[in-house]
UniProtKB/Swiss-Prot annotation:
Broadest EC class assigned to this enzyme: hydrolase
Reaction(s) catalysed (UniProt annotation): ATP + H2O = ADP + phosphate + H(+)
Ranges spanned by the short sequence motif Q motif, renumbered to the chain: 4-32
Motif (DEAD box): 157-160
Native organism taxonomy: Bacteria, Pseudomonadati, Pseudomonadota, Gammaproteobacteria, Pasteurellales
Name used for this protein in its record: ATP-dependent RNA helicase SrmB
Native source species: Haemophilus influenzae (strain ATCC 51907 / DSM 11121 / KW20 / Rd)
Amino acid sequence: MNLSQFEQFDLSPELLKALEKKGYSRPTAIQMEAIPAAMEESDVLGSAPTGTGKTAAFLLPALQHLLDYPRRKPGPPRILVLTPTRELAMQVAEQAEELAQFTHLNIATITGGVAYQNHGDVFNTNQDLVVATPGRLLQYIKEENFDCRSVEMLIFDEADRMLQMGFGQDAEKIAAETRWRKQTLLFSATLEGELLVDFAERLLNDPVKVDAEPSRRERKKINQWYYHADSNEHKIKLLARFIETEEVTRGIVFIRRREDARELSETLRKRGIRSAYLEGEMAQTQRNNAIDKLKSGIVTVLVATDVAARGIDIDDVSHVMNFDLPYSADTYLHRIGRTARAGKKGTAVSFVEAHDYKLLGKIKRYTEEILKARILAGLEPRTKPPKDGEVKSVSKKQKARIKEKREEKKKTEAKKKVKLRHKDTKNIGKRRKPSNSNV
């Protein structure tokens, strides 16, 4: 199905009005595939990188379902969205409220880190859609404070991370409590891994599988290039100069190791760049504080690892900077997908040392993008990059095939060709065998 406008999804005027207010005009790849399947009441198993509109891909069908089938009297939630973290739950709920702002639908959250009495309104008043974390919700279910019998649609967001954090059993218990539901949607950053596959098989019924990467049209909105660096110190200088000269208004700097996050952030601050950082083991209040600083403009850039940045939803990111290249091309797409959202343009740059060119080559081949090198005046590299911009890399499978072919060749050459002599073949008929047994 080739849908170019949201109107073609048969969404209600209230939802279309909200989309227009948010600045959305064209559906993303994941939305084009997931929304029609979900609106046909099929179970959906979806995967898409961060920044591809995944949240709206499941919220729009859920909200449309509530509008298509209005309840006759107030009651407990009909849509339940499970997320692995409180932070992500708050972001999903915020987006749901924005999409439902012109309706009378009620949105609520149930998460840890909130006093018990603060959730009283969720239990005692009418709720249409609830976003929750598994641990706290299961506690309320066991205490019979949350009624699962009215849940018609169960949605898992970032299911892979939910399993990694050890919430698999809690999630399955909640799914069992919502056994009267009509539909289940499961979204994940990746659909790989035995644990996730088994989890999905147990919870979904003949799902429509949606594995949508951002289309090349979407990626064209992102200007991409890289800088060749001589060393880590050279990378820091390039990064600082780039932030100062490229009008970075709201940027995310990605690094590999969490122990480097604080150090790089402090280095940038010493150079006069307003910076904050995120690392995996930070307290929730510290994480929220760092994110709020970027959103409010107190800082210009946020330094983060891929793990620490999972689930963060920040609008209007002008630049994504790969201080360290990721090990996989998938992760690269996840990173750059945080800019150029909602039809806007963005920039993604990488800082590449000589030993990174294998990774750069993988990214080029996977994304089919032409990434060109640029130079910052006064910070030209002293070393030359590998020929043709990348190191020729051979995969393990290719190495195994090459080795196998070599061994076969050796065996063939080892076999001596038997010379057929006339005396061994003459007068051979039905009753006489060759005198040479090798013939």
